[in-house]
A protein has these predicted regions:
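Short, basic/glycine-rich phosphate-binding loops at helix/coil junctions
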Residues: 117-118
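Signal peptide processing junction and immediate N-terminal pro/mature segment
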Residues: 20-42
Length: 186
């Protein structure tokens, strides 16, 4: 049930606001005769409201991809600093194997890579993004992702819903500080 509905037009923008028992909603749309600034604003809003999906084949770092065998990942990356295997726990079962390199972690469940994480600028994504790159390069490469902010860190998430997988880029200021590629275990 809508408790309040307001429509107003300011500077060529129509703003509809609705407040209901379900929460708050706002719709911003241009009115007839809008100027170029309004067109740019609308395209930015549309882009950020519809995060870009990412193809599963693009989910990887330095040639290591989700779903590949842990042995193949080890061959590509060389001998790890640490190689640990632990039980997966009651919820998922199986075994979790973690390969640790210099600022790079690869985790596998039952022999298949499900997580790759790095803070090392030497390791790039399949599309060429690395730690230290700026947000403009990220947006040019991947478009806009789903965005969340926690403290000083902004997380841009690009999902592949068909395989319940994603690429997460953590930015501090305008620079990538961490890259995470992962898939849901089930």
């Amino acid at each position: 049930m809508v408790r309040l509905f307001v429509t107003t037009a300011v500077a060529g923008i129509m703003l509809n606001i609705a407040i209901s028992s379900f929460g708050f909603a706002a719709l911003i749309r241009p009115v007839a005769g809008m100027n170029q600034t309004v067109v740019a604003l609308e395209s930015m809003l549309n882009a950020t409201q519809k995060p870009a999906a990412i193809d599963y084949s693009r989910l990887g770092i330095r040639g290591v991809r989700l779903g590949m065998s842990v042995e193949e990942a080890k061959r590509k990356l060389g001998k790890p600093q640490r190689d640990e295997t632990k039980p997966g726990g009651k919820a998922i079962g199986g075994k979790i194997r973690t390969l640790t390199y210099s600022k790079l972690t690869v985790a596998a469940w039952d022999g298949k890579v499900y997580l790759i994480s790095t803070t090392n600028p030497k390791f790039v994504t399949i599309d060429g993004i690395k730690v230290g790159d700026n947000s403009q390069k990220v947006v040019k490469t991947y478009s806009y992702g789903s965005q969340s902010v926690q403290g000083e860190v902004t997380r841009l998430t690009y999902s592949n819903d068909q395989k319940a997988s994603n690429l997460v880029l953590e930015l501090k200021g305008d620079r990538v500080q961490k890259i995470i590629v992962g898939t849901q275990l089930n």
